[in-house]
């Protein structure tokens, strides 16, 4: 899970990409909500914002704009 705009968002489905990068862990590195990890990249596929229904990434990003280079907590 991560926190964004004071809301907890659970990651329900994701894919791990074994790729080198230079970003700080937790940084959003693409418009499709790919998140830099300490090692590799997490490509989020399905998530759920607190008190909301689960959404695939396309549905979620239509209503929530998490900008590239945002550092998630």
From Swiss-Prot:
Gene3D superfamilies according to UniProt: Formyl transferase, C-terminal domain
Signal peptide positions (record): none
Domain of life from the UniProt record: Bacteria
Catalysed reaction, written as an equation: L-methionyl-tRNA(fMet) + (6R)-10-formyltetrahydrofolate = N-formyl-L-methionyl-tRNA(fMet) + (6S)-5,6,7,8-tetrahydrofolate + H(+)
Any one Gene Ontology molecular-function term assigned to this protein's record: methionyl-tRNA formyltransferase activity
EC number(s) per entry: 2.1.2.9
Top EC category: transferase
Keywords annotated in UniProt: Protein biosynthesis, Transferase
One Pfam family here: Formyl_trans_C
Annotated InterPro entries: Formyl_trans_C, Formyl_trans_C_sf, Formyl_transferase-like_C_sf, Met-tRNA-FMT_C
Family according to the record: Belongs to the Fmt family.
Role this protein plays: Attaches a formyl group to the free amino group of methionyl-tRNA(fMet). The formyl group appears to play a dual role in the initiator identity of N-formylmethionyl-tRNA by promoting its recognition by IF2 and preventing the misappropriation of this tRNA by the elongation apparatus.
Protein name from the UniProt record: Methionyl-tRNA formyltransferase
């Amino acid at each position: 899970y991560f926190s964004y705009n004071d809301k907890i968002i659970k990651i329900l489905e994701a894919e791990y990409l074994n790729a080198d990068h230079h970003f700080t862990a937790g940084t959003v590195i693409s418009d499709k909500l790919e998140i830099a990890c300490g090692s590799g990249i997490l490509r989020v596929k399905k998530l759920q914002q607190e008190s909301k229904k689960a959404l695939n990434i396309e549905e979620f990003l239509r209503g929530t704009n998490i900008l590239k280079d945002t550092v998630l907590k």
